[in-house]
Amino acid sequence: PGQSLNLQDNGIKVIVGQRQESKTWDKAIADGWEPGVSLFPIEEALEKASIICYLLSDAAQIQLWPTVKKHLTPGKMLYFSHGFGIAYSEKTGIIPPADVDVALVAPKGSGTSLRRLFLEGKGLNSSFAIHQDATGKAKDRIVSLGIGVGSGYLFETTFIKEVTSDLTGERGTLMGAIQGL
């Protein structure tokens, strides 16, 4: 919830979509999101949103894609924090329509760290990338979102470079591949 809470604290109107009767729905309520006001079932949130922050695991993004895709109307933005679904679209099937912006902000740390640093008045470095600029405003939109979520510094990349960097860091460092070599 770090990104959504930081955006809200920065004055952005945020709505959250979760599966009802789930732990994530209950957690959203515990985090202060109000059912029917700022918390909605996924499809209702998708319908209402102008920017869809697709912050699910890679596997969950693939599974939910048919539902998300039907709500991507012209001018909306599809926002990611990891580039896998787009970078490997031939495998994932995640191919957005041409009339929406597609971009990412990838904080270089967990949502918990992002939130903690935000509350301390600090920021977490993030990369940003634009896959598709249908509106001519994708860069302005994504940089604004990057600042809003609590990025201390933003550097431009591509979706494929973000995936390569992320997987190298996760697999090579956090999961011990370097130590195993």
Where are these regions (language model features)?
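Rossmann-like NAD(P)-binding element
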Residues: 19-20, 33-87, 95-110
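Alpha-helical elements of the RecA-like P-loop NTPase motor core of helicases
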Residues: 25-26, 62-66, 140
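NAD(P)-binding Rossmann-fold cofactor-contacting core
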Residues: 8-33
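Glycine-rich adenosine-cofactor-binding loop
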Residues: 2-7
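Structural signal for hydrophobic packing residues in well-ordered secondary-structure cores
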Residues: 11, 60, 68, 72, ...
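Rossmann-fold dinucleotide-binding core
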Residues: 80-169
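A short glycine-threonine-serine/GTX helix/turn-capping micro-motif
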Residues: 168-178
